[in-house]
C-alpha cells in the first residue's frame, strides 16, 4: 500500500472499535452495581451473608455460561447488527429490573416498606424469609442481565474479525476489552454516590439506561465493511489484506468458505476449540472474583467500604492500573510480529506467557497488606494481577480469529465464554461458602499463618495467582503450532 493510499484511507473501523469499547464499559458498569451496593445497602436490607451473595454471583456465572453457549450462534444467525442490538436491549432491561426487588420482596413478605424489612431482628425467621425471597428475585434479575450480556463479546469479536486484519485484531480487542476495566474504574466513583443520594434502586436504573442510549448509535453506525458508506476502497483493502495470504494457503490445502457456518457440536471436535475453552475456564473466574469481591474485601479487611472516599479510591486505583497496563496486551504481540518477524500466533502465545506471570502478584496481596496494615498495597498488587488478565484475555480472544473462519468465530467465542462462566461459577460459590465458613470459624480456621476470613482470602488469591500459568501450559500442549481449522 503506497503512501498516498495510506493518507487517503478512512478509519471507520476505529470508530466502531470505540463503540465496542463503550458497549463493554456499559456491560461492566451494569455488572458492577451489585458488588458496589452489596455490603452497605443490599446486605443489611435483605439480611444476606456472603454465602447468599456467592450463590447469586455463581448463578449469574452459570446462567451467563449457558447463554454464551447459544449467544455466539445467535449472533451468527441474526447478524452482527441485529444480534448486538437485541443483546444490549435485554441486558439493559435486566439491569433496570433490579430496582424492583426491594418493593417486590416487601410485598411478598408482607411488609409495608423496605425500612420495615431492615428493622427485622437479625437471625429471626422473618429475616430468613426476607433473605430467601430477595435472593430468588435477584436470581431472576441476574438471569435476564446474564442472558443479554452473554452476547456482548461474541458480537464484538465478530466485528473485529470483520473490520481488522489479523495483525491488528489483538490491539483492537485490547482496546474494546479495556472497556471492562474502564467500567470497573468508573463504577466506584459514580455508583456509591448515586446509591447514597438517590438509593441503590436508582443506581441500577440510571446505569441500566445507558445501554438504551448506546443502541441508538449502533443502529445508525454499523454496516458490514463492504456495505458501509464510511469505508473507502483504501480502508477496505487494508481490512482484507490477509486475503492474499489465505489464497496462497488454499493452493496447498483447500480452505473452507470464510463465511461458512459450523454447528455448535462440531466445534467441540477441534483441539483449537478446547485450547480456547481451557484458557477461559481457568482464568475468567479470576477476573470475576476481583470484580465481585474486591469492594467487600477492602471493607472487611481494611475498614474501607465504598461509602467512604478511601474505599472508592482503592477500587478506582485498582482498575486504573488495569486500564493502563492492559493496553499492552494488544501492543506486545504486534511488536513481536512487526519488529521481530514472528508469526501472529507465535507472538500471541509468547505474549500470553509473559502476561501469565502478572497474576502472581496476587499471592503477595494479603501477606503484604496485613503485614504493613495498608489497603493500598493489595490494591496495587491486585490491579497488576487483573491487568495481566485483561492483557491475557485480549490475546486469548484473538486466537479464535487466527484459527477459525469468520462464520464460526461468534459460535466458538460463545463456547469459550460458556467455559469461562462455568469456571467462574465454581470460584464464586466456593468463595462465598469459604468466606462465610471462615468468618464463623474465626481463629479455628487457619491457612499459611492467617486465621479466619483473612485465611479465606489468601486461599482464593493463591488460586488466582497460579491459574494463568496452568492454563498456558495446557493450551500450548493442545495446539503447539499455528494450525487453522479446516471445515
Regions found by a protein language model. Give the residues of each.
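Multi-pass alpha-helical transporter architecture, strongest
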Residues: 214-222, 362-370, 457-487
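Helix-loop-helix hairpin linking two adjacent transmembrane segments in secondary transporters
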Residues: 180-229
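Primarily marks hydrophobic transmembrane alpha-helices of the MFS/SLC 12-helix fold
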Residues: 84, 138, 349-352
Amino acid at each position: 500500500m503506497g503512501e498516498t493510499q495510506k493518507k487517503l484511507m478512512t478509519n471507520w473501523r476505529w470508530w466502531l472499535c470505540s463503540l465496542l469499547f463503550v458497549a463493554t464499559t456499559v456491560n461492566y458498569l451494569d455488572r458492577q452495581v451489585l458488588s458496589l451496593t452489596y455490603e452497605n445497602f443490599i446486605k443489611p436490607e435483605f439480611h444476606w451473608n456472603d454465602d447468599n451473595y456467592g450463590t447469586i454471583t455463581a448463578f449469574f456465572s452459570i446462567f451467563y455460561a449457558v447463554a454464551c453457549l447459544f449467544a455466539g450462534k445467535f449472533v451468527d444467525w441474526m447478524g452482527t447488527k441485529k444480534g448486538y442490538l437485541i443483546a444490549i436491549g435485554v441486558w439493559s432491561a435486566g439491569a433496570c429490573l433490579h430496582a424492583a426487588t426491594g418493593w417486590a420482596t416487601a410485598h411478598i413478605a408482607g411488609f409495608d416498606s423496605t425500612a420495615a424489612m431492615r428493622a427485622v431482628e437479625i437471625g429471626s425467621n422473618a429475616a430468613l424469609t426476607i433473605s430467601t425471597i430477595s435472593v430468588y428475585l435477584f436470581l431472576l434479575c441476574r438471569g435476564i442481565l446474564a442472558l443479554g450480556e452473554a452476547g456482548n463479546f461474541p458480537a464484538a469479536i465478530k466485528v473485529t474479525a470483520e473490520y481488522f486484519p489479523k495483525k491488528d485484531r489483538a490491539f483492537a480487542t485490547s482496546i474494546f476489552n479495556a472497556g471492562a476495566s474502564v467500567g470497573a474504574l468508573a463504577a466506584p466513583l459514580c455508583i456509591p454516590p448515586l446509591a447514597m443520594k438517590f438509593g441503590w434502586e436508582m443506581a441500577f436504573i440510571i446505569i441500566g439506561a445507558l445501554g438504551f442510549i448506546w443502541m441508538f448509535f449502533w443502529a445508525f453506525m454499523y454496516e458490514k465493511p463492504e456495505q458501509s458508506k464510511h469505508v473507502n476502497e483504501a480502508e477496505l483493502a487494508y481490512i482484507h489484506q490477509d486475503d492474499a495470504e489465505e489464497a496462497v494457503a488454499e493452493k496447498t490445502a483447500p480452505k473452507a468458505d470464510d463465511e461458512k457456518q459450523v454447528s455448535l457440536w462440531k466445534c467441540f471436535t477441534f483441539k483449537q476449540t478446547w485450547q480456547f475453552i481451557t484458557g477461559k475456564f481457568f482464568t475468567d473466574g479470576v477476573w470475576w472474583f476481583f470484580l465481585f469481591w474486591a469492594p467487600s474485601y477492602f471493607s472487611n479487611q481494611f475498614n474501607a467500604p465504598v461509602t467512604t472516599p478511601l474505599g472508592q479510591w482503592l477500587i478506582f486505583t485498582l482498575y486504573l492500573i488495569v486500564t493502563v497496563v492492559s493496553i499492552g496486551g494488544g501492543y506486545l504481540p504486534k511488536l513481536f510480529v512487526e519488529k521481530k518477524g514472528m508469526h501472529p500466533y507465535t507472538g500471541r502465545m509468547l505474549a500470553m506467557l509473559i502476561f501469565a506471570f502478572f497474576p502472581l502478584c496476587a499471592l503477595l496481596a494479603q501477606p503484604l497488606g496485613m503485614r504493613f496494615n495498608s489497603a493500598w498495597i493489595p490494591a496495587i498488587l491486585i490491579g497488576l494481577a487483573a491487568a495481566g488478565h485483561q492483557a491475557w484475555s485480549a490475546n486469548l480472544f484473538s486466537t479464535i480469529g487466527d484459527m477459525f473462519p469468520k462464520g464460526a468465530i461468534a459460535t466458538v467465542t460463545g463456547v469459550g465464554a460458556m467455559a469461562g462462566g462455568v469456571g467462574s461459577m465454581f470460584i464464586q460459590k466456593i468463595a462465598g461458602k469459604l468466606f462465610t465458613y471462615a468468618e464463623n470459624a474465626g481463629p479455628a480456621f487457619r491457612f499459611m499463618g492467617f486465621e479466619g476470613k483473612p485465611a479465606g482470602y489468601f486461599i482464593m488469591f493463591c488460586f488466582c495467582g497460579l491459574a494463568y500459568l496452568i492454563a498456558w501450559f495446557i493450551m500450548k500442549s493442545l495446539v503447539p503450532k499455528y494450525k487453522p481449522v479446516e471445515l
